[in-house]
Regions:
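Residue-level signature of transmembrane alpha-helical entry/exit and packing/kink sites
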Residues: 37-49, 73-82, 113-121, 162-167, ...
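Transmembrane alpha-helical insertion/packing segments
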Residues: 23-82, 178-181, 244, 249-265
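Transmembrane helix-loop-helix hairpins at the membrane interface
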Residues: 163-337
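Hydrophobic core of alpha-helical transmembrane segments in multi-pass integral membrane proteins
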Residues: 50-58, 83-94, 125, 129, ...
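Membrane-helix interface linkers and caps
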Residues: 27-32, 62-69, 74-126, 138-143, ...
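Juxtamembrane helix-loop-helix connectors linking adjacent transmembrane helices
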Residues: 75, 105-177, 329-337
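Alpha-helical membrane-inserting segments
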Residues: 55-64, 91-92, 127-140, 229, ...
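N-terminal juxtamembrane cytosolic/stromal segments of multi-pass membrane proteins
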Residues: 1-43, 99-107
Length: 337
């Protein structure tokens, strides 16, 4: 993990014009025109994906609220409709010639996963959780001072595990579909324009899609980890890490291990988060030179962000998801006053 990045240029040259160096002026004009077409296509498909997913997920939540008697019934109904929503969403991308499935399977990862790298990646996710909880604590305090009493930092509810269907969606279906869409179809399409831009952009649209501030803070940082793993170690490893985060970390450790190992005021989950944070800080300090080199070698061409965030479809995607994110808090604020 973060060994040396001078190999990146050689790696790109070996793969041909599909992955040219984004800093080469000879390709700049071509890159801009090609990127405009790609980001426009991505924006249109993101809008379709968003509408389809939230429509069927919304139908499932409404049906569960109307008919469910127990927590198992509620999460079972929601889980079924989430499977439908995710499956149909994946089909939207799968049948596109612009985003062929073979690009994902044919992607050549420049690095091989080692036990040490895998352990550091897993620890980094716990470190990310620690940082996200600090951010959420600050946001929670700010909202409280504005007269909006909300709880953003809370333990995972055991009710989530009452339905096996919902657990399967959370631990298997969601990671697979999200990795296909955000890191596979989108990430591998944009990789040639600069890995750093690709990692940050896919992390942003991935986090916004959760439309929940509690999840968005964590999923943005986790999305950076997932995207880095997908690009550097391969799609299959991104799926594995994502599954571990959703199932092993969020369900097995946060719920069951926390109940089995009661450390008093300081829970086992908090201990793991703290250890992960310490490891993450050490990795950043010890590998800072390599991280900086990676950013320098793999940054996108000048103006790539301006082109991206002036696309109408990208703007609409961001605005709608921000609306869904903050609407509940505006409603609380209006009700309070």
């Amino acid at each position: 993990m973060f060994e040396s990045y001078k190999e990146e240029v050689t790696f790109n040259e070996q793969r041909g014009s599909e992955d040219f160096d984004p800093q080469n002026e000879f390709y700049k004009e071509y890159m801009e025109e090609s990127f405009k077409k790609d980001i426009t296509s991505i924006g249109r498909r993101l809008i379709g994906y968003m509408l389809v997913f939230f429509f069927f997920a919304g139908v499932g939540q409404y049906a569960a609220q109307q008919r469910a008697v127990t927590a198992e019934d509620f999460y079972g109904m929601v889980g079924v409709w989430l499977f439908i929503a995710a499956g149909l969403s994946l089909l939207i991308w799968s049948f596109s010639k612009k985003f062929p499935m073979k690009r994902i399977y044919e992607h050549v990862a420049p690095r091989k996963m080692t036990i040490q790298s895998f352990a550091m990646i897993c620890a980094s996710l716990y470190g990310v959780r620690f940082i996200s909880k600090l951010f959420l604590g600050g946001i929670e305090k700010l909202l409280f001072e504005m007269g909006i009493p909300v709880t953003l930092v809370a333990n995972t509810s055991e009710e989530l595990t009452s339905s096996i269907i919902f657990v399967l969606y959370l631990g298997v279906m969601a990671p697979v579909v999200e990795e296909f869409i955000f890191r596979g179809f989108i990430g591998y399409r944009l990789e040639r324009y600069g890995k750093v831009f690709t990692i940050l952009f896919t992390a942003l649209i991935f986090s916004l899609f959760h439309a929940n501030i509690t999840q968005e803070v964590f999923t943005f940082m986790a999305g950076i980890v997932f995207a880095y793993v997908a690009i550097e170690y391969g799609f299959q490893w991104a799926v594995v890490v994502h599954m571990m985060n959703n199932f092993i970390f969020a369900v097995v450790l946060d719920i069951y291990l926390a109940q089995m190992m009661n450390l008093g005021d300081f829970s086992i989950v908090q201990l793991l988060d703290l250890v992960g944070f310490i490891i993450l800080v050490l990795v950043v300090i010890l590998k800072w030179k390599d991280i900086k080199e990676y950013i320098d070698v793999n940054r996108g061409f000048y103006g790539i962000s301006q082109i991206t965030f002036t696309r109408v479809t990208i703007i609409l995607y961001i605005i709608y998801l921000l609306y869904r994110t903050f609407l509940p808090y505006f409603a609380l604020y209006l009700n309070f006053y």
